[in-house]
Regions:
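Thiamine diphosphate
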Residues: 1-132, 137, 154, 174, ...
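Short acidic, glycine/serine/threonine-rich loops at helix termini
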Residues: 36-41, 70-73, 93-97, 118-124, ...
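Short helix-loop-beta junction
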Residues: 42-47, 285-299, 349-350
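Conformationally flexible catalytic loops at phosphate/diphosphate-handling active centers
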Residues: 52-56, 167-262
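Conserved thiamine diphosphate
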Residues: 123-173, 197, 353-366
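Terminal amphipathic helices with adjacent charged low-complexity linkers/tails
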Residues: 172-211, 315-353, 359
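Redox- and metal-dependent alpha/beta enzyme cores, enriched for Fe-S-associated oxidoreductases
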Residues: 267-295, 308-313
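Peripheral docking tails and interdomain loops at the edges
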Residues: 323-411
Length: 423
């Protein structure tokens, strides 16, 4: 399938795909996600039509909490609804996320992941915000590049509808949200072709309606609450297959090979990294550089983080692996490890990889740059089971020593850096 090439950033890529599947967008701007809401508002004003032949109804609320409440109400009324947020704004949505997930409403929250204010505020990128939502019941889908945002945002929307589970569709703030790339874009007819219209109609039929009234939002006593809470299990058990089904549809359309976990590197790798987000592009470049020197290394790119499918992860790891380094872009003080690391340990503990050494590392907090030389340090590390990269930690001595900068750019490439000064 031939697709149009356009130059855009990650925010516009997410907005382009999400607009197609949305009846309503409830918005409140926050850096670095504001561009998604602004683009959606602009397109609706210009009369752009979604796949249903309608303009998206855009409503700006008084806060992110209000936007989340509007998403909840709009979904309950039978309108496919999305929003765009990050950081403290996403935290304000958490109470509503529990309700949206508990009522199995197919909303999509598009997030350009950003740091949370702790010892200081940071408007820059990491995964602190999305990791604060991992127990809400929302599925979580991650993209690594602008092209992946374009390709996989439809998967979040379509899997939410068919799987009856809301999605947090996220990518790295600034590094992906504001990176401008020439990418292949979706035509809305192709997006419409992938949609399950029967599932969409079933969602609309389930809406609150005085012609067939039902009770929602009740309070339950101890005699039934636990049982009712467990009733959602089959939907989460089935969701990884639903996500892969739509990834396969995308693959069929555009010739890609998207999976819940994608492996890149040597077939007989002995040391691999497991990571999410834009760092995977850096890791891939570093793998190519090391492969030229005969190193057997690889990376598993996590796409579907929630629900975490242990078998899909196991299937993605080469049998030859002797050491795994898990990279997390968040910090949970006091925990035994960061979230992705703990999930990997739990997934592999009873598998054929139960004896493989698993190390845990932090990187990129507050948009700290992660370079190929730092990734080389991760692959060369065989002793420090807990580590950081990108900083010099002279307090707790967790940082890995980084060697001289390495050049992974292909020969013949011209690099340019442009500096802009002024208001």
């Amino acid at each position: 399938m031939a697709r149009k090439m356009k130059t855009m950033d990650g925010n516009h890529a997410a907005a382009h795909a999400s607009y197609a599947y949305s009846d309503v967008a409830a918005i409140y701007p926050i850096t670095p996600s504001s561009v998604m809401a602004e683009a959606t508002d602009e397109w609706a004003t210009q009369g752009r039509k979604n796949i249903f032949g309608q303009e998206v109804q855009v409503t700006e609320m008084q806060s992110e909490a209000g936007a989340a409440g509007a998403v909840h109400g709009s979904l309950a009324a039978g309108a496919l609804t999305t929003t765009y947020t990050a950081s403290q704004g996403l935290l304000l949505m958490i109470p509503n996320l529990y309700k949206i997930a508990g009522e199995q409403l197919p909303g999509v929250i598009n997030v350009s992941a950003r740091a949370l204010a702790s010892h200081a505020l940071s408007i820059f990128g990491d995964h602190s915000d999305v990791m604060a939502c991992r127990q809400t019941g929302c599925a979580m889908l991650c993209e690594s590049s602008v092209q992946e945002v374009m390709d996989l945002t439809p998967v979040a929307h379509l899997a939410a509808i068919k799987g009856k589970v809301p999605f947090i569709n996220f990518f790295d703030g600034f590094r992906t949200s504001h990176e401008i790339q020439k990418i292949e874009t979706w035509d809305y007819e192709d997006l419409k072709d992938m949609a399950d219209m029967d599932a969409i109609q079933a969602f609309r039929d389930h809406a609150l309606n005085p012609n067939h009234p039902c009770q929602r939002g009740s309070a339950q006593n101890p005699d039934i609450f636990f049982q009712a809470r467990e009733a959602c299990n089959p939907f989460y058990d089935a969701l990884p297959a639903v996500v892969q089904e739509y990834m396969d549809k995308v693959n069929e359309k555009i010739g890609t090979d998207y999976k819940l976990f994608n492996y890149y590197g040597a077939e007989d790798a002995e040391h691999i990294i497991i990571a999410m987000g834009s760092v995977n592009d850096t890791i891939e470049e570093t793998i190519d550089y090391l492969a030229a020197a005969g190193k057997k290394v690889g990376v598993v790119k996590v796409r579907l983080y929630r629900p975490f499918c242990a078998q899909a992860l196991i299937d993605a790891i080469p049998d030859s692996v002797k050491q795994i380094s898990v990279l997390d872009r968040t910090k949970e003080p006091g925990a035994l490890g960061e979230p992705l690391y703990l999930d990997v340990v739990a997934a592999l503990k009873d598998s054929k990889f139960k004896d493989v050494k698993i190390f845990t590392g932090r990187y990129g907090l507050g948009s700290k740059d992660t370079t190929p030389a730092q990734i080389v340090a991760v692959y060369e590390n065989t002793t420090k089971e807990k580590f950081t990269i990108g900083i010099v930690d002279d307090v707790t001595n967790l940082s890995l020593e980084t060697g001289a900068p390495i050049v992974t750019t292909p020969e013949g490439t011209t690099n340019c850096k442009f500096w802009g000064l002024g208001a």
